[in-house]
């Protein structure tokens, strides 16, 4: 059973919600307003590893979405505008080198994806 705990916040009527796995580890913590995710949210796997951080506005992804490798290094960063990819989306190798970059407008890729190999050399 997932245990939910609501904590009241003093900022702009937001509440903070936390959810836990059966083993007691935190599943997520998120700011909510009017029953919608609103603000920053962080998600962990069952072993306690941070897997992503997401920014929400009125229940929609709005801002950055960051995914992490189990090692803690950044796997990807994408920008969203009301649930649609908008701006740069970058993937990284676990060593921190860029893997790919794609630019989006209104959830549509508008430029060719640039790709790199693990050494940082552009692939053609």
Q: Which residues does each predicted region cover?
A:
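Glycine/tyrosine- and acidic-biased, solvent-exposed loop/turn segments at the edges of beta-strands
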Residues: 7-124
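Sec-dependent signal peptide recognition
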Residues: 1-4
């Amino acid at each position: 059973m997932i245990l939910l705990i609501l904590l009241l916040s003093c900022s702009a009527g937001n509440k903070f919600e936390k959810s836990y796995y059966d083993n007691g580890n935190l599943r997520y913590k998120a700011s909510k307003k009017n029953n919608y995710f609103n603000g920053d949210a962080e998600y962990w796997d069952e072993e306690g590893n941070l897997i992503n951080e997401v920014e929400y506005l009125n229940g929609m992804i709005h801002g950055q979405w960051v995914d992490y490798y189990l090692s803690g290094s950044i796997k990807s960063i994408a920008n969203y505008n009301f649930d649609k990819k908008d701006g740069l989306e970058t993937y990284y190798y676990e060593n921190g080198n860029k893997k790919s970059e794609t630019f989006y407008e209104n959830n549509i890729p508008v430029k060719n994806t640039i790709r790199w190999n693990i050494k940082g050399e552009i692939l053609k």
